[in-house]
């Protein structure tokens, strides 16, 4: 969404981004986030670990999910639960830097054990039958629609995002566009309080707030929501976004 706003500013009147901050296009200057170096350092830990983005950008991730022993439906259930507010282990906070000491503070869905695929990683966090029955924000009926869809299409499409994000040629093409360092249209950032996406890249939230958005309407953190903020708390999410657009309209009158 931010890249669209930068490339086609005349087609964008406002922007709302969710979960992961966007700190700008100066990719070469983001010296801290060197995914290969980060992953090498994580591999050197004992037990060895790996960064989820590099893993999900690889060829094995889709096969790992599609052929997982628990089945796609249970994979999705545990994955959604693991990254939600409902999982007690999600207590995100600021990280000082990209050192392994700091990064390994994040949950296993971000800093994975090196010998496990994503399906094995999340299988340990399958919620109870009682939880599944009471989970109003992701019913079994809705989950079955998702799982049946992915059975037909696989996860290659969604996973390709990681490959594009980390691809050096793609980064260079973006740099060659000489895009603006700022977005000047009204902007809002929304995330759940239990979402580690806010802090997984140290410093990005502050850079986004102070440098990238030139017409910033604020960071809205929604209580009792995790990574799936629009599913977990749809009414609250709608309320903050609707309020954002009302403020824009009022400023234009």
Please provide the spans of the model-predicted regions.
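Catalytic active-site module of serine/aspartate enzymes centered on a nucleophile-bearing elbow/loop
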Residues: 214-253
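Flexible "cap/lid" subdomain of the alpha/beta-hydrolase fold that forms the substrate-access gate
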Residues: 4-217
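Alpha/beta-hydrolase fold nucleophile elbow
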Residues: 1
